[in-house]
Amino acid sequence: MTRIKRGYIARRRRTKLRLFASSFRGAHSRLTRTMTQQRIRALVSAHRDRGKRKRDFRRLWITRINAVIHEMGVFYSYNQFIHNLYKKQLLLNRKILAQIALLNRSCLYTISNEIKE
């Protein structure tokens, strides 16, 4: 079998890997095999948590809206508030409603009075 001279290709690949793993702790930033494993693990976690972040923010928005609704005493439940929004065809998503609830509660109060039956 003939010898294959690869030159700088393997070194270039490892330096790219080292740049990616430079912030990892211990052997995960020093040893090539553990660097590759840790890189795969990091990318898997990043992919998983991109979806999780969307769910977490939706939960946060719902919690904020629910807290302000209970504080105002307009409706006794969050889901009834959202249901009445859809019935009146007001196109406000949960993110915008949460921002209104935080920054301008009187505006949310007027919205809730508009959609009351």
From Swiss-Prot:
GO CC annotation terms, alphabetical = chloroplast; ribonucleoprotein complex; ribosome
GO terms under biological process: ribosomal large subunit assembly; translation
The entry's keywords: Chloroplast, Plastid, Ribonucleoprotein, Ribosomal protein, RNA-binding, rRNA-binding
CDD domains the record matches: Ribosomal_L20
Write out the annotated subcellular location: Plastid, Chloroplast
The family note in this entry says: Belongs to the bacterial ribosomal protein bL20 family.
The record's function comment reads: Binds directly to 23S ribosomal RNA and is necessary for the in vitro assembly process of the 50S ribosomal subunit. It is not involved in the protein synthesizing functions of that subunit.
Database matches in PANTHER family: 39S RIBOSOMAL PROTEIN L20
This chain belongs to the protein called: Large ribosomal subunit protein bL20c
Organism of provenance: Barbarea verna (Land cress)
- Tell me the lineage of the source organism: Eukaryota, Viridiplantae, Streptophyta, Embryophyta, Tracheophyta
